[in-house]
Design a protein with these regions (language model features):
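Aromatic-lined carbohydrate-binding/catalytic grooves of carbohydrate-active enzymes
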Residues: 192-282
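Catalytic and substrate-binding clefts that recognize carbohydrates or anionic sugar/phosphate headgroups
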Residues: 1-196, 202-209, 216-221
Length: 282
């Protein structure tokens, strides 16, 4: 079901001892005994730390970033419970959002007991090891391993990664607008939305041909402008012991949606787009 319970038992956690510093024209190499080498490169606005792991026994890594009490932090991907991350820790692990966002509520407890499907405040389909600070910098950890970003301490943020990351990147700016520009320069910018999305509502429908297009007709009958419909079960559904799921073969279901290509052409003639689960648009 895409729901995980992750626990850990740390046998040993020890601070790295700096044993050598090698400085060149544009980098500083920090050698920590025979465990890790950190290559630091900084310019006016950007600092990168590239790590070279020398001992493969290291499978956990903690990194602290100085903080202040008034600072706020945002990000860590799509976080749906709290905008400001301070005061909480956020595991970075892809999962279903789950039922409920609070383990103290009855609905979440019941979902956990019966189906292990209860959600928590940090459960998200899209976590990301990146955050933005009101001190006008962003930090990104280049790693795909499980991580936990802890913002509970007033004087530092502690980032835990279940491997030695390839790189930690910190970039700052004088304004939030400039910071956003630098973030999107690194990660990539989303393209502008097409003009047609502003033509009306984009409604979510499912349940077969009659119900889905029937809801569209009812909406149009009330003189509501519609730009498109999003239909996740266009490929059919399967009923399992843990609920309804899609067929996942990404072919239109000829029983639930007979003559779907024809229906799509009909609504296209009205200026309405059709989206499927994979965000293909007709």
């Amino acid at each position: 079901r895409g729901n995980f319970k992750i626990t850990d038992y740390v046998t040993e956690r020890f601070p790295l001892k700096l044993t050598d510093v090698i400085q060149t024209a544009d980098t500083v190499r920090l050698c920590f005994e025979s465990y890790i080498i950190a290559k630091i490169k900084c310019d006016e606005n950007l600092c990168t730390i590239d790590f070279e792991q020398k001992d493969d026994r290291i499978n956990r890594f903690w990194f602290r970033v100085a903080a202040d009490k008034e600072e706020k932090c945002y990000g860590c991907g799509e976080q749906m419970s709290y905008f400001n991350l301070r005061g909480r820790n956020f595991p970075i692990w892809t999962s279903e959002p789950g039922v409920g966002r609070d383990k103290t509520t009855y609905v979440t407890w019941r979902s956990d007991v019966e189906n292990k499907a209860g959600g928590d405040y940090y459960n998200t389909n899209y976590p990301q090891p990146t955050f933005v600070s009101t001190n006008k910098y962003y930090l990104h950890v280049d790693s795909t391993a499980y991580a936990d970003f802890d913002f509970r301490n007033d004087s530092f943020h502690e980032l835990q990664i279940w491997e030695v990351p390839k790189q930690i990147r910190i970039e700052c700016a004088d304004t939030y607008l400039k910071l956003l520009e630098r973030i999107t320069t690194y990660f990539g910018r989303q393209p502008k939305l097409p003009d047609w999305v502003y033509n009306g509502l984009i409604i979510g429908v499912q349940g077969g041909n009659e119900r889905s297009f029937g809801l569209l007709d009812k909406t149009l009958d009330r003189n509501i402008k519609v730009a498109g419909i999003w239909c996740q079960d266009w490929c059919g559904k399967r009923v399992t012991s843990f609920g309804k799921r899609l067929q996942w073969d990404w072919k239109y279901h000829k029983e639930m949606y007979p003559d779907l290509p024809k229906k799509i052409k009909e609504i296209n003639a009205k200026g309405i787009k059709f989206w499927d689960m994979l965000i293909h648009i007709w």
